[in-house]
Amino acid sequence: MEPKTKKQRSLYIPYAGPVLLEFPLLNKGSAFSMEERRNFNLLGLLPEVVETIEEQAERAWIQYQGFKTEIDKHIYLRNIQDTNETLFYRLVNNHLDEMMPVIYTPTVGAACERFSEIYRRSRGVFISYQNRHNMDDILQNVPNHNIKVIVVTDGERILGLGDQGIGGMGIPIGKLSLYTACGGISPAYTLPVVLDVGTNNQQLLNDPLYMGWRNPRITDDEYYEFVDEFIQAVKQRWPDVLLQFEDFAQKNAMPLLNRYRNEICSFNDDIQGTAAVTVGTLIAASRAAGGQLSEKKIVFLGAGSAGCGIAEMIIAQTQREGLSEEAARQKVFMVDRFGLLTDKMPNLLPFQTKLVQKRENLSDRDTDSDVLSLLDVVRNVKPDILIGVSGQTGLFTEEIIREMHKHCPRPIVMPLSNPTSRVEATPQDIIAWTEGNALVATGSPFNPVVWKDKIYPIAQCNNAFIFPGIGLGVIASGASRITDEMLMSASETLAQYSPLVLNGEGLVLPELKDIQKVSRAIAFAVGKMAQQQGVAVKTSAEALQQAIDDNFWQAEYRDYRRTSI
């Protein structure tokens, strides 16, 4: 499923002179040919030498290496993105291992916190509650008419950092950068959006540089009516768009997903994308150990919308492997700050109710307390898999990990909280506490661990292995909805590309250098499943693959021809 080399057709454009140089999607900078410089009134506006994109990328790489901090590197890359998008993606794809953590997690967290301070140039759409009656006009102001993917946030739950107001715009920008870099979706088809509904972050409200609406967050009916106005305006402007909800607070994330997933082609990456990549990782890890996921007992720390979304997808996968729903649910244990979720626990959220354990089934557990802590659960359940989505650092203690290892020779430990400052335990500690026997996957990037002269590669359970392929598959197939089965097909495909499964060694997830290949394979699986489920028009496998090839954008300059407006 490698992309076929295709001759790029000439592009006819009406812009010229300084206007063309200020258009990030079209600007080539020093790579404009002499003929183009004459035809587009660029003579004298650029240095004499005509460069290739690789020469430009090499200069940018040298400049990038001159920056000492990750946030300065992030600012530099964003500046390139805002002046020459083709060069930006060529540079990022040339150095994806180095630059993905800079354009997205963990560095994007700091960029969101400092958004108003480091702001240079507008990108995307800012829709404030004050402008709610101008929603249609705002979307009409977007110059790109053929938007195919929107990532939207309200900035309330940015990574593990909480309410960042309009600073949350850094997340949709970063996410869409990965749709392009990893999934080949043209940047001309993407649109980042932030819904500015105020902020409850007092530090931002007191910051004279803060650029958002200085007001406490709207809530309840006002909030949901505002979001609905946005959804209806999007449907009117781009009826076939894929809409990704990103970093909404727990109280809103699941209700919004449930409300709109059958009204517009949409999904929530924090819930469904995280679940899909985690399940793909667990399928691969289970196969590498010579078994199936359905044979494992799993404990979660964190029972919010993300954790419960992962749990439900695990349950669906283990049912596919032959378990009944009841048996599948009995193998999943959810622990939050109040302890193990049981049917006797008050004030459960709606999405938690199906994930409780029956209290009477726990009467023989080795504890006198009515509240079962994480250590109690690990000691009594003897899990094979421990997953952290708590957003709190250090909660996987040495005592807990050693207790788990006591009963499980090859534990799978996944501290998934972002950014790195919120991780439940570091890979270095987990490897040491399990005498080198744990299989570790994290939510943020970590360097390989060296323990007793042996190198342990650490897989990043990165949603970027999933959502770009889903987006490409939706666009190529013309899917009108994203179903649970489409997400499951993405997980299964990801597991098939595990080096640990294929070779018996290495990472449990593919290397980043292979991410475009993996995204294309996921796109095919997702598109095929969409056709099988009737949410996309059925075609031959060859036609679907051709559609993926045709929609896979490459960071290459096209030849320009002049046309009138």
UniProtKB/Swiss-Prot annotation:
The keyword Methyltransferase does not apply. One of its GO terms (molecular function) is malate dehydrogenase (decarboxylating) (NAD+) activity. Signal peptide: none annotated. A divalent metal cation binds at residues 246-247, 270. NAD(+) binds at residues 157, 270, 418. One of its GO terms (cellular component) is cytosol. Its cofactor is Mg(2+); Mn(2+). GO terms for biological process: malate metabolic process. It holds the Pfam family Malic_M. Keywords: Metal-binding, NAD, Oxidoreductase. It is an enzyme of class 1 (oxidoreductase). It comes from the Bacteria. CDD domains: NAD_bind_1_malic_enz. The active site is at residues 104, 175. The record marks 270 as: Important for activity. It catalyses: (S)-malate + NAD(+) = pyruvate + CO2 + NADH; oxaloacetate + H(+) = pyruvate + CO2. Divalent metal cations. Prefers magnesium or manganese. Belongs to the malic enzymes family. Homotetramer. HAMAP family: NAD_malic_enz (MF_01619). This is NAD-dependent malic enzyme. It comes from Escherichia coli O157:H7.
